[in-house]
Amino acid sequence: MQSVTYRRRDYLFAVRRKVVDDQLGWTICMRSPRTHEWLPVLGERPFAGHAEAEARLVRLAKDNKWEVAYAYGIDFASPENK
């Protein structure tokens, strides 16, 4: 399984398995810098599959210019020298 955690300032964003509205699913969450608790991002619905949720997180990260904080199970290509 592939998993990426993104960072924006002191906040981390990742896909977590959580119960939201009495439904267990994959949810895009934000880690609170004060409590260190993973909280569901408001307005984002739970996904049935992990790949769906990761794809949505990648789109959000690209649109908001978040940087990669951690990556598991993904090989990133080394930057090319120009």
What are these model-predicted stretches?
Residues 1-30, 34, 71, 77-82:
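Short N-terminal "domain-start" leader segments
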Residues 3, 13, 25, 40-43, ...:
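Compositionally biased amphipathic helical and low-complexity segments enriched in hydrophobic
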Residues 18, 48, 53, 63-66, ...:
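N-terminal processing/targeting junctions
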Residues 53, 68, 72-75:
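Residue-level detector of alpha-helical recognition elements and their boundaries
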